[in-house]
């Protein structure tokens, strides 16, 4: 089937880029089939498996694996049809008991914050975890509780679409939770790298697919990081009726510029640090990746989400607080909120490098606007940075 689609472009997939302009991504049948056949060859899903689909099917990630691969194999797909809040997801996982879970970091991090953190933050639990003979048993119990909460039948959780909170990732490795992190983009329909959870290298984004190639382009050979560039079966033909953007995104020798900065090890594992367009250059010449600071801040008490911006050469964190949690504890008062955020700011700055320290936390009145894959539309908040 893939051969007869080789030169036919399917209906363009529209998505929002960081600049705010929509681009139609032209994906061929081969691009889509490359992802589907990879899923079949690696047995991500088997005939008769159950899948809970809660990612937008208009997004390449959900479309390729929750729908195309799932239907090609012959699985039972349950469409959630609701906003995937932790409470709704927990109930759905219990009912469906999926064999594979495909998700984005925001969802899994909320589950960690709501299910796991309340357990490990208890004084008695902290004491027990400090005893070497007990920590292994307790981690095993926590792992079982988390697996049971997600339905108890899945072989692994595949996370992609955005950067994973390093604290959450480290904890999942510590308890030997079966998860892996992949990497992709709509222009690759979407998969670029993936490794099964038992082969996954911590802090990586998986291994480059055998039908893809990746290289790290550095303008200065002495730079530690470079732009990740890819080519192969999954790469789009270009942007719909936009030759200028197409020319800009491809190198002269045919590699796709991802716009992501990172490294590649000898085993073809990709390590991603951040987006070149969101990187902030400090006054001392250091590269600051706001997503890494946000990941730490989002894991702190009563922080629902955050956005780190540069204002007058200083870092400022916009925070949308978890008002529901504050209300439930009777803490939703201005003085309480200020005390909590001051403590969060102190703890945040104690956990980052000197050039990454945040000057202030500014409360934001609403949730940040997001893309279908739940990434914040950063470009909408540039004017706040310039205030």
Task: Mark where each language-model region is.
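Conserved pre-ATP/AMP-binding loop-to-beta segment of ANL
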Residues: 1-14, 21, 44-50
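Conserved AMP-binding A3 loop
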Residues: 11-36
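Conserved AMP-binding/adenylation subdomain of ANL enzymes
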Residues: 33-50, 57-145, 153, 178
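Conserved ATP-binding loop and adjacent catalytic segment of the adenylate-forming AMP-binding
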Residues: 78-80, 157, 164-226, 234-237, ...
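Conserved ATP-binding/catalytic segment of the ANL
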Residues: 222-282
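Adenylate-forming
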Residues: 235, 269-298, 325-336, 352-358, ...
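C-terminal boundary motif of the adenylate-forming
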Residues: 261, 300-324
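Conserved C-terminal "lid"/linker of ANL adenylate-forming enzymes
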Residues: 305, 310-316, 345-387
